[in-house]
Amino acid sequence: MDVPVAVNEDKLLLVSVGYSACHWCHVMAHECFEDTTVATFMNEHFVCVKVDREEHPNVDKVYMDTVTMISGSGGWPLNCFALPDGRPVFGGTYWPKASFLRILSLMASMYQEQRAELLGQSAAIHDACSKMYSVKKADAGSGVTRIDLTTTTTALSGRFDHLLGGMGEAPKFPMPCVYEYLLGYAAQAEREEKEERERDGPQPEAPYSATRPSPEAESERVASHVAFTLECMARGGIHDQVGGGFCRYSVDAGWHIPHFEKMLYDNGQLMSLYSHACIQMASQDGPPSPLLPLFRRVVSETASFLERELLVSVPSDREGESPIAFLASLDADSEGGEGAFYAWTHTELREVLGETDYPLFADFFGVSDSGNWEKGLNILKCDKTPEAFALSKGLEVSNFLERLSAVKSKLLDVREQRSRPGRDTKALTAWNAMTVVGLVDGYRALSDPGLLSLAVRCGTYLRDVVMGGGDPEGSGLTLLPGQLMRVCTVSTPEGADTPTVSLSVNGFLEDYAHTVAAFLALYRVTFEEEWVISARLCADHCLQYFPRDMSGDGTTTTLLPFTSSLDPALPSLTVETEDNVIPASNSVMCEALLSLGALCTTASGEEGDTPPYTTIAKNMLRDVSPVFKQMRGLGHSNWARLFLQTLTVEPVEVCVLGPSHLEWGQRLRREVDGLCVGARVLIAASSGEGSCIPLLSEKEALYTERGGPDTLVYICAEGACMPPCDLDGALDTLHRLM
């Protein structure tokens, strides 16, 4: 990764990494980079490179891992010093002006006077990073067991904050994939306990053991804590009580005061998480959870926020509604400072709401005359759900909800007149794909066709624009089949009547993984095979250009590198395995390949065409197993969810063929969602001829032999396929199997 200017001028690189919505990035830019003294010194002694981490996460990861290794923590802005060939030597995060000048002076003098020491330090960092990214091919017998998952759950449970929700101390991040795993673990444990009770009949109650609680007690505690955490987040200031959507994290332990930037990836994933919680709650025996209405509103209001504030229409020659994309983020800052757009004085609220509504809703939103934040400002939060608050005040719930909706509309109208936070101008492929999945999950939870429409239009953008064979503006950009571009900017040049689209940055593994997942999510609710075709095209490109055996000698992992072989080499070739706020790209691709393989595998167990998606995915699970067990699954929650599915879920295949395939497929899909067993059941549907999906084309031959024309359902489970049946028979069979 030589930087010619740095090589020619014999200077260190100073790589500064940030992103549009980062508050402290803007602070350091103003204090240091815009200061004449600092900027002059930087330009005299260094070759300075500014990097948007959202556009180039591969560069960010190389230098962030270095800084984390050196200091024990990371964050943005990220400032890293590197040799002219790009190898890092030292770095840190935010530095105020005086500290930054001292560090600049020290690094400049060390490069001139102690270069050998810097070279040695760089070599040590490079070796450490190479070991970090080296995941060897594991033995077949080293896989994760159910006991390992119990260990993971116990370790996570030990970090629960039972008073305020979430885990650990401030700052608190939502961490959707952690709670997705815990939701799945609790649901699976509940199913197993139910099966055990039905099999064994009533049993005498076992004595409680504080050191070894029963699985049932653990599953109940896990499910309860997930619901409690989602409630606390929904009631807190991290959730925009007026406009919907979530901020990036809470600076306090009680989810009250957010760091006000709003990120697309958070909101897409949280839509999925709250939707899955809704589906799980709705499927439980007995009365519905009192939290279900709150969680439904969170899903709906988050989608409304995305549509209102981040959506852009993308030019297209296709008939019908235009494709859409969602922009990456909203800044924390506006003209009034950090959070000013979202905060209220009690005087402002009283003027907007009037004397009739103000006392009640000031109480509901935790407003005080002196403010509940800083400088007399209030961040709206709720100590109770709307339903619980209404009952505590002796009010009719439905009437209070109507008044609350009207109050939110008034506040939103007033807020829209304020100076707005900066909005990023780029759309990122991976984050849009996450949002497609979130919208699909929201549709499955709420049965709101508007959410499905948004998902399809954004999926169309992913398929036809960023994977569509070239830049619509004729920039000379030519894409290979299935290749993705990461960054899309939609803008209207001065004097032009129509917006233009500009694509840049070759896609990274996370773009491919999430896009394949998005296409498959759309197929599951539309049964339109074009989504499977696109998923295969995208996955095949990824498997070709993200080499699995990077050593060439067959000894390295089947896990995929983060960067395509089409891109210039970086100082380290990163392999992302750790699930963070965004799950590891390898874990997402692994799940996508498992799903794709299920559609492309026949009853004989053969995968229709190469590459063998299922085999690759199983090898990925095998190779990540040693590090998963070493870490007790901590930092690997999405992997834990995949292991849980593959260890405990016997998949059921449902193929619907015939003239009513769409209607029947949708009916069966709704039934599966109602039973909360979506991960266990694969539903595919076709008219009965010409399917491009191997799982269906195999059944089409059987369907044709019967002569049609009736619609039939073919169900395979537990290694055996049952005789074809009608819709009622299929529903009965699913209930029996579940």
Model-derived segments and their meaning:
Residues 1-438, 442-445, 471-477, 498, ...:
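Replace the tail clause
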Residues 31-34, 454, 533:
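Glycine-rich, phosphate-binding/catalytic loops in enzymes
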Residues 21-25, 246, 267-270, 439, ...:
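Extended, hydrophobic alpha-helical segments in both membrane/secreted and soluble proteins
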